[in-house]
Amino acid sequence: MEIAEKIAEYVNPINFENLKENIIREAKRRIIDSIAVARGALNSPPHLINKNVGKYFQGEIPLLFGGYSTPDFASFYNTFLIRYLDFNDTYLSKEPLHPSDMIGAFFSLGSLMDLKGKDLIEAIVVGYEVGVKLCDSTSLRKKGIDHVTFLQVAAVAGLSKLLKLNEKETVNAISLTLVPNIALRETRSGELSMWKAGAAADASRKATFAAILAKNGLTGPPKPFSGKMGFINVIAKDFDSSVFNNLSIEGILKTSMKKYPVEYHAEAVVEAGLRLNIDPNDINKIDVETYEAAKTIIADEEKWNPTNKETADHSLPYILAYTILRKDFWLDAYSKESIFNEKIRNIMKKINVYENEKYTSIYPKELPVKVIVYTNKGKEEVEVRNPRGYYNNPMNDAEVEEKYLRLNGKREELNMLWKIEELKVKDIVTSIKGI
């Protein structure tokens, strides 16, 4: 059976009234987290660019923190804010994903259709489940394809739920999203650019446009996955279709939140750095052992000389050196002064990163990292198996709120966001203010 058809069959029956309380609570936590990290990006250079670009897309859909635009640009704009800090949630499997990237699109079409918070929660549950299954099916990274290719399919599944598309329309929406829009992994190769966040924003934009097209009757190729020139035959012959045999509502519980503003493979690196009790001036050498994905993604050649925020938040040596020196890791770590700080650079020169095959075999059930520091006084070793926020070591509600407040959120907003079921999506969006 065509995968798009399986997804379409799954989408329609999902109903808020039948969702478990822990699933509803988790969806609310992701909404809170998404708004928190979006607010933290308000002064970022890409956001200022997007505000100027928005002048060309006049519309009536409310944007996060003020302004109005067209549905597709609102999805792009909201998602760029959510994604930019690399501080939103993550799913790690054969392919990684930042599932809350799709929430920016849900804010847009939820506002367009005058829907309520409970409709938003339904869309999140659907989108997360589809995203998790796609990431379980194959690795895109190893094929040179970017994970936002899966994001847009997951997003359009959630948007199909929001728009109440029937099964045939949902298949068309998936096809109109996937077939024209295969994203290249070059986005995340070497020195990173603003497009690291833009790729997710663009995927949300494309999913939004495809969903609206399908709602109005436009058809797409009927077999976007299984067709002769479809996704599986052209890109992913190893695609494991069986993962779609047991679609549920619990995919969101397998995804993870971030305590620190770093690429997820570096969350454990920050924790390890904070546990070390050493004088930076005494360091002779630092050996780091981790799994293949972490070494490949955050310790490749370009990550040893980061020159911008986009590369620094994907740089294991920078993140570890900063943490050892400052005994904290927050957004100020990405100032130009910090990125080019000589003391941090000197510590980076003493770091070596190695793949530990045992750790590779454990990943992604665990995210192990071991940091061994050799000093004038001897050796100190710290191992972290699962950082705080990982799905098997989740942040509690108080920690989620603490993150929201530290990113300049307001307590009254939190009180509202925990009770959004009957609130209009557009009212939720317009009530959230900037810094």
Model-identified regions with their sequence ranges:
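Glycine-rich, mobile lid/loop segments that gate access to catalytic sites or pores
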Residues: 114, 118-205, 221-228
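Hydrophobic alpha-helical hairpins/lids featuring a short glycine-rich hinge
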Residues: 82-138
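Terminal-appendage/accessory-domain detector
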Residues: 1-95, 192-205, 212-435
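Residue-level detector of well-ordered alpha-helical segments, enriched
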Residues: 23, 27-31, 101, 119, ...
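Well-ordered alpha-helical segments within folded domains of soluble proteins
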Residues: 100-106, 151-158, 204-209, 266-270, ...
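Generic structural signal for well-ordered, non-membrane alpha-helices
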Residues: 5, 9, 33, 125, ...
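Generic structural signal for well-ordered alpha-helical scaffold segments
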Residues: 110, 160, 273-277
